[in-house]
Design a protein with these regions (language model features):
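Positively charged, polyanion-binding regions of nucleic-acid-associated proteins
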Residues: 1-10
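Mobile-element integrase/transposase regions
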Residues: 28, 40, 45-129, 140-159, ...
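RNase H-like two-metal-ion nuclease catalytic core shared by retroviral integrases
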Residues: 163-165, 176-220, 236
Length: 278
């Protein structure tokens, strides 16, 4: 087990993912508690454990500081009543129906070794299913168009998208004379024609579902790409089609009732999503 874990080099999986790989590749079935103990004894901490340990140590340090302040002064200060920044905005409650809200984002990460690319991703807020993914060199209109096409093809028309305030969603008009660069007109027009509302937010907690998904993907996907010797965007986009099915089976399926509406036929979608050239 230790040799297997070491074989991943610097790109090591978290303990739960490692247990899945052990069962799949070596036919070794141990609980994550047992494997975690073996790794600890050998001096290994999983990436997830390191983050959890840092949070615990940070909380312990804060507690000690508060205790020291209490001993030094009986009068409360303003800092005693300040809320932690990450708690100032409560998390958004999960929606009830599939298609009611789709959260979208793009994650820049070295998915293939040292090469940084952007993974455009969309997750259904109610079910937790990934409904669209696409790799591109940058966060692009083209990337989100591919994600939208995947949603329309497999699921249908959702009620609303939730995104951050990126240029591709909120920029009303560019100074360029190229219609191609008027990104809001491009994506916003397509959504308007389909009857999809777009909401934007700069608050991470508001789109916590897709933020957490990005963290999970960054932990798992690079290892699976490496295992399958995938080193290019085109290879990765083909691989993602079957990878998503396995991911959703394991982590999604939290809602069954749907409000997705029937999407236009492929020919109509192609016309609607066609990018306007010069």
């Amino acid at each position: 087990i230790i040799e297997k874990y070491q074989s991943y080099g610097d790109l090591r999986p978290n303990v739960v993912h490692f247990c899945e790989l052990l069962a799949e590749e070596e036919n070794i079935a141990y609980s994550d508690t047992t494997v975690r103990k073996l790794l600890y004894q050998a001096g290994f901490l999983s990436p997830k454990t390191q983050r959890a340990t840092k949070r615990r140590l940070k909380q312990e340090a804060k507690q000690k500081k508060r205790e020291a302040e209490k001993r030094g002064s009986k009068l409360p200060t303003a800092s005693n009543f300040l809320e932690e920044p990450d708690k100032a905005h409560p998390s958004r409650a999960r929606k009830k129906f599939k298609g009611e809200l789709i959260q979208m984002d793009a994650s820049q990460f070295p998915w293939f070794g040292q090469q940084e690319t952007h993974l455009h991703v969309a997750i259904d807020d109610a079910s937790g299913d990934i409904v669209g993914v696409y790799f591109d060199t940058q966060e692009t209109l083209n990337g989100y168009y591919h994600v939208l096409e995947q949603i329309l093809e497999v699921q249908g028309i959702p009620f609303q998208f939730l995104t951050d305030k990126r240029t591709v969603f909120t920029y009303a008009s560019s100074q360029s004379k190229k219609i191609e660069e008027d990104t809001f007109t491009q994506f916003g027009y397509a959504c308007h024609q389909l009857g999809i509302a777009i909401e934007t937010s700069s608050i991470p907690q508001a789109k916590g579902r897709v933020e957490r998904l990005n963290q999970t993907l960054q932990s798992r996907l690079p290892i699976d790409l490496q295992r399958n010797q995938i080193t290019s965007i085109s290879q990765a986009n083909r691989y993602l089609k079957r990878w998503i099915k396995r991911f959703n089976k394991q982590f999604g399926g939290l809602a069954s009732e749907s409000v997705f509406e029937k999407a236009p036929k492929p020919a109509q979608r192609n016309l609607l999503l066609a990018r306007i050239s010069e």
